[in-house]
């Protein structure tokens, strides 16, 4: 959250140059405050686990957040009861007429399937297109990040020979971005995917900017230049046991998976996993919610034309 300071205080320029969020008394006096409305499109098989992971991060901020859960279809989920889905989830037709401050689109276990071959691809495209007019900021996670970059910018991914699974060191490639406030120079984040984007293609795209990357895992944080779309190539929401659960699931299915890198103590699956990314995940979602949702969204959500770009603040 911002520090409110007197108008024209000399320290303001110094703090802003250090990427510290300060707000003048004049601007603070004109701020309206209300709960943030966030929609979550949950594409993961275990709906309840993913709900818990995302709500844990959203709940770790000073802002009040009202959450709606969205499903892609009304078919029964393999890992979640239809009663749960019917009770807590909405269909797109229920929210199509609404506007939201934020939208989170989760990953999905579809890493090796061409986007156009995904059975609900048309629904994904429709929701992404809708979000560009009805949502202040969209957070795309893992598979959804690849899908969003493909649909919005025509960028395709490369399928990997082996699943990339593990916890990798990342570094900031830009400095003075609100999203990166409080980030260490290097930080950890988990990945679990069968594909990757071409980082040079991302860097050369005029509408995108790469904010963080890994020597081992490639591009990690990519932001559209209009600040409306944030693409996160990993899984900062994962809890400590998730990569372990996925590894043993793949073993049971005879997929001969590689051991997740930098995850188990001594890289031995018989030892405990080490969670190195929770503080990063909390800070990432907090910064997104504060700087790219709360600070930019209109008080009156019926008027999305009032979304304030960063350069106007």
Curated annotation (Swiss-Prot):
Pathway, per record: Amino-acid biosynthesis; L-methionine biosynthesis via de novo pathway; O-succinyl-L-homoserine from L-homoserine: step 1/1
GO molecular function: homoserine O-acetyltransferase activity; homoserine O-succinyltransferase activity
SUPFAM superfamilies reported for this sequence: Class I glutamine amidotransferase-like (SSF52317)
Keywords linked to the UniProt accession: Acyltransferase, Amino-acid biosynthesis, Cytoplasm, Methionine biosynthesis, Transferase
Stated role: Transfers a succinyl group from succinyl-CoA to L-homoserine, forming succinyl-L-homoserine.
NCBIfam families cross-referenced by the UniProt entry: metA (TIGR01001)
Protein name, UniProt field: Homoserine O-succinyltransferase
UniProt organism field: Shewanella sp. (strain ANA-3)
């Amino acid at each position: 959250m911002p520090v409110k300071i007197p108008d024209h205080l000399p320290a303001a320029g110094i703090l802003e140059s250090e990427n510290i969020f300060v707000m003048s008394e004049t601007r603070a006096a004109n701020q309206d405050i209300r709960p943030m409305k966030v929609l979550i499109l949950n594409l993961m098989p275990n709906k309840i686990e993913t709900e818990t992971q995302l709500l844990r991060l959203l709940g770790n901020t000073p802002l009040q957040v009202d959450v709606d859960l969205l499903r892609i279809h009304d078919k029964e989920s393999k890992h979640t009861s239809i009663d749960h889905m019917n009770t807590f989830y909405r269909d797109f037709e229920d929210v199509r007429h609404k506007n939201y401050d934020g939208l989170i689109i989760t990953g999905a276990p579809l890493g090796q399937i061409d986007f156009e071959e995904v059975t609900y691809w048309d629904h994904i495209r429709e929701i992404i297109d809708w979000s560009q007019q009805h949502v202040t900021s969209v957070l795309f996670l893992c598979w959804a990040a690849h899908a969003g970059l493909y649909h919005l910018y025509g960028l395709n991914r490369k399928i990997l020979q082996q699943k990339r699974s593990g916890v990798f060191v990342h570094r900031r490639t830009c400095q003075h971005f609100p999203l990166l406030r409080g980030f260490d120079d290097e930080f950890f984040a988990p990945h679990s995917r069968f594909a990757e984007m071409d980082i040079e293609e991302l860097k050369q795209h005029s509408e995108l900017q790469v904010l963080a990357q890994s020597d081992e895992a490639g591009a990690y944080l990519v932001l559209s230049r209009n600040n409306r779309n944030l693409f996160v190539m990993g899984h900062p929401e994962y809890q400590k046991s998730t990569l372990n659960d996925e590894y043993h699931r793949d073993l049971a299915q005879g997929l001969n998976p590689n051991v997740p890198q930098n995850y188990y103590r001594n890289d031995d699956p018989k030892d405990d996993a080490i969670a190195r990314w929770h503080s990063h995940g909390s800070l990432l979602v907090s910064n997104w919610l504060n700087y790219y949702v709360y600070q930019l969204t209109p008080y009156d959500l019926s008027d999305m034309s009032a979304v304030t770009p960063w350069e106007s603040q």
